[in-house]
Amino acid sequence: MSNIEERVKKIIVEQLGVDEAEVKNEASFVDDLGADSLDTVELVMALEEEFDTEIPDEEAEKITTVQAAIDYVNSAQ
């Protein structure tokens, strides 16, 4: 597991209050991890802060799974 992947998953666990074992790459924030729209906004904000980047709204809307978050952060680095 890459450092970025570990950091993204740690943020997801902290933000959504889910068990680390539930945070699989293919997991959907809403369908699998029980996030609502406010949770996803807070998650994007936490990712922006952790990785010192700005995620435009149109990109943030596409980040719906753990893997999508990892991929976005990797591409933004």
Swiss-Prot record:
Pathway listed: Lipid metabolism; fatty acid biosynthesis
A Pfam family that the UniProt record links to this protein: PP-binding
PTM text: 4'-phosphopantetheine is transferred from CoA to a specific serine of apo-ACP by AcpS. This modification is essential for activity because fatty acids are bound in thioester linkage to the sulfhydryl of the prosthetic group.
A single GO BP: lipid A biosynthetic process
GO function terms (MF aspect): acyl binding; acyl carrier activity
Keyword Oxidoreductase listed: no
Record-annotated Carrier domain positions: 2-77
Subcellular location: Cytoplasm
Keyword annotations of the record: Cytoplasm, Fatty acid biosynthesis, Fatty acid metabolism, Lipid biosynthesis, Lipid metabolism, Phosphopantetheine, Phosphoprotein
Domain of life: Bacteria
Positions of post-translational O-(pantetheine 4'-phosphoryl)serine modification: 37
Keyword Lipid metabolism included in the entry's annotation: yes
Gene Ontology cellular component list: cytosol; membrane
Role summary: Carrier of the growing fatty acid chain in fatty acid biosynthesis.
PANTHER family: ACYL CARRIER PROTEIN, CARRIER DOMAIN-CONTAINING PROTEIN
Family of the protein in this entry: Belongs to the acyl carrier protein (ACP) family.
Entry protein name: Acyl carrier protein
The organism of origin for this protein: Vibrio harveyi
